Amino acid sequence: MILDAYRSCGWRHRGFDTGYGKVVNRWNWVRTFDGIKDERTLLASYKPRTRWSVNRARTSGVRVRELGADELGTFVDIERKTAGRRGFMARDEDYYRRFKETFGSRARFMLAEIHADELLAGLTAEHDRLADRLDSLRTRYEAHATTRLKRQIDDTARNLTALERRLDEARALTTHGSVIPAACALFVEHRRETVYLTAGALPEYRAYQAPALLVHEGMLRLCVNSTQPRRFNMYGITGVFNDPDDEGRGVLEFKQGFDGHAEELAGAFILPTSTIRYKLSEAAHTIKLLKEAGR
């Protein structure tokens, strides 16, 4: 019905394609929150890997805050580095300043930072606690050896070894600063939905799972805890769901981890203002496709 209405007005549909759209996304990933009342039920709705990522970020000293208008340079720097790595076009700081001026408080520029000193202090305290526990278990084992105590000693020793590796990483991290920007995201609030418009992350801090916590906090603050019921539009996916080698596979799996569903839109339309020019453009496009197919 929609297609017929547009066609009756002279518009031409560009087709039911897949991939990332240049004019408009034809495929989006959308999350609604029926039955979600608080953070506990929100986390429970995620896939196990995503839930682990959110919890890992929090226990790794990652904190999310909103950027002020005078801090947009940090956002732009992270997005620019991400764009260079992934091959999409980054906007400059002036663009985002104008964006903020236009949308005002509805444009939420969020930053995930690693609080390295806080992380190091927490891991050190946990290390001391485990070391004391291991000493206590060994003392009890020497006094009265049991299989149960031996198992507890082995488990605690393994946990202590893993924690020592994290401590070494945290000590190295503090050389980059006490608070380190790791990822950013722009959420835009509308009456019925919040849009996860664009984001960026620094690969050297991938292990800290900052992007997962950013999305979680966006959903929690701007949808679940909002007085205005909203859905969460995670925006573009390619629309290819059964090809593990598709260019958008990683993005799809990341978004799927937060639950939700794919939403297929009608796509792009054009209105020819010159029949001759339109036919020439279509012919050139067809020739290009044939050449690409023949390679």
Map each language-model feature to its residues:
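Active-site/acyl-donor-binding loops of N-acyltransferases
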Residues: 9-37, 229-295
